[in-house]
From Swiss-Prot:
Disulfide feature: none
Gene Ontology biological-process entries: rRNA base methylation
Family as reported in the entry's similarity comment: Belongs to the methyltransferase superfamily. METTL16/RlmF family.
Subcellular location(s) per record: Cytoplasm
Biological function: Specifically methylates the adenine in position 1618 of 23S rRNA.
EC number(s) stated in the UniProt entry for this protein: 2.1.1.181
Gene: rlmF
Origin superkingdom: Bacteria
Protein's name according to its UniProt entry: Ribosomal RNA large subunit methyltransferase F
UniProt entry keywords in alphabetical sequence: Cytoplasm, Methyltransferase, rRNA processing, S-adenosyl-L-methionine, Transferase
Chain spans, region Disordered: 1-24
C-alpha cells in the first residue's frame, strides 16, 4: 500500500543557539563593528535578504571581520594573520571555551574559577592565537599555546606582544610532529585544562577537496569567478595529518596517560561525529574517568568536544583546594 504523504509543510527544526554567555548571539551590529574597525566598511555587502554582511568566500573580508569582532567584543586592538593560515569563526571558538568553563564550574559549586591561577594548554594554537585571546579576556585564565609551525608561532607572538599579553599568554614550539604533550609540558607543571582543534583531514588532497566543497556551499562557485587560491604549504598542520582527525585524537588519548596527574581536564574538539564513540571507548580502556562528549551548535553547524580526566574524586578535590581561587 502506498505510503501516505502529508500536504502540510514540516516545521523547521529550531535553530541551534550559542552558549548563553557567548557574546555573539543575534545578528551582528555592523555599524558598531565598523566604528571599532573602520576598514571593515570596505568589505560590507548586502545579502539576498537586504541585510548587511560580508562575502565569507573572500579571505581578506573574513580576516578583517574577525579583527573587528575581537576588537569590539574582547578589546583586542591588534590582530592579523599571514596569508594562507586558518581564520577561525570567533563565535564557535568562544563556545568551546564557555563549555570548558562550565565543566570547571560544575566541580566548584557552580562558580567558574577565574584568574591566572587557572592554567590552560592550547595544543596547536595556530597563527591566530584565538583561544588564548578569548579565554583570557573572558575568564582571566593564563594560557600556554603550542605549535609545530614556526611561522604560526611568530604570528601568534606578534599578536600577544602587540596587545601586551606576554605575562598571561606563553607560546612554545613543538619540535616533534608526532608529539602533543611531550616536549611541551615540564614535569613540574600542572594545567586545569587542555584544549585542541585537531586537523580534520587525512591528506592534502582531501583538505583541498573539502575547501572546494566549502566554497560551493557558500554559493560562490560560478564560471566567472575563480575559487580562492589556498596556500596548503602554510596550512598543512592546521588542515590535515596522517590518519586524519581519528588518528590525531587517538594519539592524544594515548599520550595523555603519561600526564594523568598533571592535568585536571583534558579535552579536544571532534568535528566528525563518527569519531566520538571510538575515542570514548579508547579513553575508557586507558583508564580515563568522567569521559564525556558535550554538544555545541552554531547556527546550522553542530560540533562537540570530548573531555576526560585521570584524577579520582579525592584527587580532584585536593587539586581544587590547592589551586583554585576561593570565591
Amino acid at each position: 500500500m502506498p505510503r501516505k504523504t502529508s500536504s502540510q509543510p514540516r516545521p523547521a527544526e529550531p535553530k541551534a543557539v550559542l552558549h548563553p554567555r557567548n557574546r555573539h548571539s543575534g545578528r551582528y551590529d555592523f555599524p558598531k563593528l565598523i566604528a571599532a574597525c573602520p576598514e571593515l566598511g570596505e568589505y560590507v555587502i548586502l545579502n539576498p535578504y537586504g541585510k548587511q554582511s560580508i562575502d565569507f568566500a573572500n579571505p581578506d573580508a573574513v580576516r578583517v571581520f574577525n579583527r573587528a569582532l575581537l576588537r569590539q567584543f574582547y578589546g583586542i586592538q591588534h590582530w592579523d594573520i599571514p596569508a594562507g593560515y586558518l581564520c577561525p569563526p570567533v563565535p564557535g571558538r568562544a563556545d568551546y571555551l564557555h563549555g570548558l568553563a562550565d565543566l570547571l564550574a560544575a566541580d566548584n559549586a557552580g562558580v567558574i574559577p577565574r584568574g591566572a591561577a587557572v592554567r590552560v594548554l592550547d595544543i596547536g594554537t595556530g597563527a591566530n592565537c584565538i583561544y588564548p585571546l578569548i579565554g583570557h579576556r573572558e575568564y582571566g585564565w593564563r594560557f600556554t599555546g603550542s605549535d609545530i609551525d614556526a611561522t604560526a608561532l611568530a604570528s601568534a607572538r606578534t599578536i600577544v606582544a602587540a596587545n601586551r599579553l606576554d605575562k598571561v599568554i606563553e607560546l612554545r614550539r613543538q619540535d616533534t610532529s608526532t608529539q602533543l604533550f611531550k616536549g611541551i609540558l615540564a614535569a613540574d607543571e600542572r594545567f586545569e585544562l587542555t584544549l585542541c582543534n585537531p586537523p580534520f583531514h587525512a591528506s592534502q588532497a582531501e583538505a583541498a577537496s573539502g575547501s572546494q566543497r566549502k566554497w560551493r556551499n557558500l554559493g560562490k562557485l560560478d564560471p566567472s569567478r575563480k575559487l580562492p587560491k589556498l596556500n596548503f604549504g602554510g596550512q598543512a598542520a592546521e588542515l590535515w595529518c596522517e590518519g586524519g582527525e581519528a588518528a590525531f585524537v587517538a594519539r592524544m588519548a594515548d599520550e595523555s596517560v603519561a600526564y594523568a596527574k598533571q592535568v585536571y581536564r583534558f579535552s579536544t574538539l571532534v568535528s566528525k561525529g563518527g569519531n566520538v564513540a571510538p575515542l570514548m571507548v579508547r579513553l575508557q580502556r586507558l583508564g580515563a574517568l568522567q569521559v564525556q562528549a558535550l554538544d555545541m551548535a552554531q547556527g546550522q553547524k553542530k560540533s562537540r568536544f570530548v573531555t576526560w580526566t585521570f584524577l579520582d574524586a579525592a584527587e580532584q578535590a585536593a587539586w581544587r583546594t590547592e589551586r583554585w581561587p576561593r570565591s
